[in-house]
């Protein structure tokens, strides 16, 4: 029998990670799974509230599951990523990254640009890139298979919007994924 009480999907640069938490309130068991792999297992934890901290993804992003009693034997489980609630983390992340999803040569691809470092990730792999200044901004070039790709960065001309990033694959613009 499983004591699965919470499941979260966390989008990081190297992909979307599934975090699952088992809490056996009668057995004292706590188990954390990341992408189906057991990360933490504790038995006989008779203090039923508390927290479990672990790391997720290629960048070893810190994650914490908080276990709080809400009434009697009812519990609330919240996930923090890098010290922020999952909701707040995802809101901040949407400001610091751009994400595109496309199908190329029969394969689903997820391309992520980290705006602060200009690092580009494709399906969990950090890509080798080459930056180039062009008349109206910059282009960050990389390859996926034998396909030429680049992310064009141009000013929106509006302070509130900032820089607009566009993914071009084989001279075709790919729409950005909105969260």
Curated annotation (Swiss-Prot):
It is found in: Cytoplasm. One of its GO terms (biological process) is positive regulation of canonical NF-kappaB signal transduction. GO terms for cellular component: cytoplasm. Keywords: Acetylation, Apoptosis, Cytoplasm. Widely expressed, with the highest levels in brain, thymus, kidney, and spleen. The modification N-acetylthreonine is found at residue 2. Belongs to the FAIM1 family. Plays a role as an inducible effector molecule that mediates Fas resistance produced by surface Ig engagement in B cells. This is Fas apoptotic inhibitory molecule 1. The gene is Faim.
């Amino acid at each position: 029998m499983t004591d699965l009480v919470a499941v979260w999907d966390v989008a990081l640069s190297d992909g979307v990670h599934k975090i699952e938490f088992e809490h056996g309130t009668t057995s004292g068991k706590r188990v954390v799974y990341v992408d189906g792999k057991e990360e933490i297992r504790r038995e006989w934890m008779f203090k039923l509230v508390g927290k479990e901290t672990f790391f997720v993804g290629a960048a070893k992003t810190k994650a914490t599951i908080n276990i709080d009693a809400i009434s009697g034997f009812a519990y609330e489980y919240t996930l923090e990523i890098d010290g922020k609630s999952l909701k707040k983390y995802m809101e901040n992340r949407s400001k610091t990254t751009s994400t595109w999803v496309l199908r190329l040569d029969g394969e689903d691809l997820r391309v992520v640009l980290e705006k602060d470092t200009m690092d580009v990730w494709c399906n969990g792999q950090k890509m080798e890139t080459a930056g180039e200044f062009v008349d109206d901004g910059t282009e960050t070039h990389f390859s996926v298979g034998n396909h030429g790709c680049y992310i064009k960065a141009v000013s929106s001309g509006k302070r509130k919007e900032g820089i607009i990033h566009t993914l071009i694959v084989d001279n075709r613009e790919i729409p950005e994924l909105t969260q």
